[in-house]
Amino acid sequence: MSRSTKDRCMRYWTAALLGLALAASPVAAKTKPVPVEGQTPQPAIETGNYPYQLFVPKGYLTDTAKQYPLLVFLHGSGERGDDVAKVKVHGPPKIAERDPAFPFLTVSPLLGTDQDWDIDKLDRMIDHIAKTYRIDPTRVYLTGLSRGGHASWRWAIAEPKRFAAVAAVAGRGNPGEACRLMDLPVWAFHGDRDDVVMPEGSFAMARAIRACGGRKVRLTIYPDLGHNAWDPAYDDPALYAWLLEQKLPSPTITNKDKK
């Protein structure tokens, strides 16, 4: 073999080995696909966790210095199953589907049939989102309707410093633990003729928070309305304006390796 041929072979194998080394390196392992603006279905972040709809606001790809508020939406019993598109029939994902300028990066997980919301799974999902996208860690919001409203109360009670504000729609919480929410901005919504989740569920939580000295709780009761308090609640721009006014005094989620 001539010297020039040997040199070419050496360069070839050097380049090949370098490519393999880079592919196995931590830098390559952290490479992530570029996010897509708009609303897209996403697989579960781990086995046993929830698939979800992810909404990325218009402008996310061009304004790369901007951090976005994160809104977590928990649906009700009627949307459970294996079709993640069903989470878009109500609430923030419905709004985001028709408005690309909806200002929140929105995560809407899907419960499987006969499942209930698991806070540990939700925590891991939100930690993943916060580390992956440009989230403002002082503006993380939670909302849910019916079964998702129950879970919103429960999650907020378990971690009252995780969220800047919570909006619980047609849900009920545990008044015995309401004092944990005395410093958290909360807005509860209910129809006064709800015979699925009685409006007393929201009344009791608001009373209990106020009895503890909480002054950041709001309660909206819709007259002559049944269980569907979510349409008027989520269609009201005042809700989203109120959410955006609330901020945590310090971050409670990490924000590394963001896309």
Q: Can you say where each PLM-predicted feature lies in the sequence?
A:
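Catalytic histidine-centered segment of alpha/beta-hydrolase-like enzymes
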Residues: 226-233
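Conserved alpha/beta-hydrolase "acid-adjacent" motif
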Residues: 196-201
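A domain-start/cap signature at the N-terminus of enzymes
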Residues: 26-70, 150, 155, 167, ...
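Active-site machinery of serine-nucleophile hydrolases
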Residues: 70, 74-124
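Catalytic active-site module of serine/aspartate enzymes centered on a nucleophile-bearing elbow/loop
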Residues: 235-255
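Primarily recognizes the serine-hydrolase "nucleophile elbow" in alpha/beta-hydrolase
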Residues: 138-182
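Short beta-strand/loop motif that positions the catalytic acidic residue
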Residues: 188-190, 194
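Gly/Ser-rich "nucleophile elbow"/oxyanion-hole loop immediately N-terminal to the catalytic nucleophile
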Residues: 59-66, 114-146
